[in-house]
């Protein structure tokens, strides 16, 4: 298998319910439009000069392997609020960047604050200058069915 450095990326987030926690996770992926592909989990370094997309490319083949950084949480505890967030930091000159993920029993704002702090620290320890910060998140309060919150950065080789 040959891996190609991704050229484009998109940030997505969704929350959903399902008959089981795994079905809730799958339903959140379907809401994002990535439920019929294989997510290949990555660590959190963004290639230089990546282009950020506003919408998913059309006609992504079923079963395609997509490099992904994602955070997720599932719960079946009624009344619990769960959130997932991804923070993306882009360096000056778009020479690369970092993605940090967080998921927990919390409100969306808490998850977003957490990833912002992580991105800032990641840049500081590398001696990089943060030019831009982006965040994507999802929140849901569990009712009668299990629920999931998922946030993802999907990368494309084309």
Curated annotation (Swiss-Prot):
It is an enzyme of class 4 (lyase). InterPro entries: Pyr-dep_his/arg-deCO2ase, Pyr-dep_his/arg-deCO2ase_sand, Pyruvoyl-dep_arg_deCO2ase. Transmembrane segments: none annotated. The record marks 43-44 as: Cleavage (non-hydrolytic). Binds 1 pyruvoyl group covalently per subunit. Keywords: Decarboxylase, Lyase, Pyruvate. Pfam families: PvlArgDC (PF01862). One of its GO terms (molecular function) is arginine decarboxylase activity. One of its GO terms (biological process) is arginine catabolic process. It catalyses: L-arginine + H(+) = agmatine + CO2. Its EC number is 4.1.1.19. The keyword Secreted does not apply. The modification Pyruvic acid (Ser) is found at residue 44. The keyword Lyase applies. Its cofactor is pyruvate. Belongs to the PdaD family. PANTHER family: PYRUVOYL-DEPENDENT ARGININE DECARBOXYLASE. This is Pyruvoyl-dependent arginine decarboxylase. The lineage of its organism: Archaea, Methanobacteriati, Methanobacteriota, Thermococci, Thermococcales. The gene is pdaD.
